[in-house]
Amino acid sequence: METQRASLSLGRWSLWLLLLGLALPSASAQALSYREAVLRAVDQLNEKSSEANLYRLLELDPPPKEDDENPNIPKPVSFRVKETVCPRTSQQSPEQCDFKENGLLKECVGTVTLDQVGSNFDITCAVPQSVGGLRSLGRKILRAWKKYGPIIVPIIRIG
């Protein structure tokens, strides 16, 4: 009788350990990677967008150096998305779409949570201020210098 109780008790402990072992991997599987969380945020941005085409992740800044591994705490993110050739109404994944030549580029910043079940994000995307204006101004100055520099330099030396 005593052996039967010990055997039953051992069986219960084995069952508890087995259940605990099965529960642990599923708990850790609920945390998304930093990149996966951003890709989910991009999907949500595409769903809420009123623009014609889907956007796809172009570049992701490295994750912040944090000691906190809690997937429920928002993590700061910074990334860039670019317009693709796929219409927003298509059911295609943005990752399968080619980037549109001269497609619109957007810089996005905000926070994401890595929790797979209740993943939240607060992302703002904007078209970056054009540095092309500065480039074209620089080119104009360079062209003017090449054209008028040989005339101006002797005048400056005389004066």
UniProtKB/Swiss-Prot annotation:
Q: Where in the cell is it found?
A: Secreted
Protein name, please?
Answer: Cathelicidin-5
Instruction: Tell me which species this is from.
Output: Bos taurus (Bovine)
Entry's Gene Ontology molecular function annotations:
lipopolysaccharide binding
Pyrrolidone carboxylic acid PTM positions: 30
Q: Which residues form the propeptide?
A: 30-131
List keywords of the entry alphabetically.
Antibiotic, Antimicrobial, Disulfide bond, Pyrrolidone carboxylic acid, Secreted, Signal
Recorded name of the encoding gene: CATHL5
The domain of life is Eukaryota
The record's family statement is: Belongs to the cathelicidin family.
- Role description: Exerts a potent antimicrobial activity against Gram-negative and Gram-positive bacteria, including methicillin-resistant Staphylococcus aureus, and fungi.
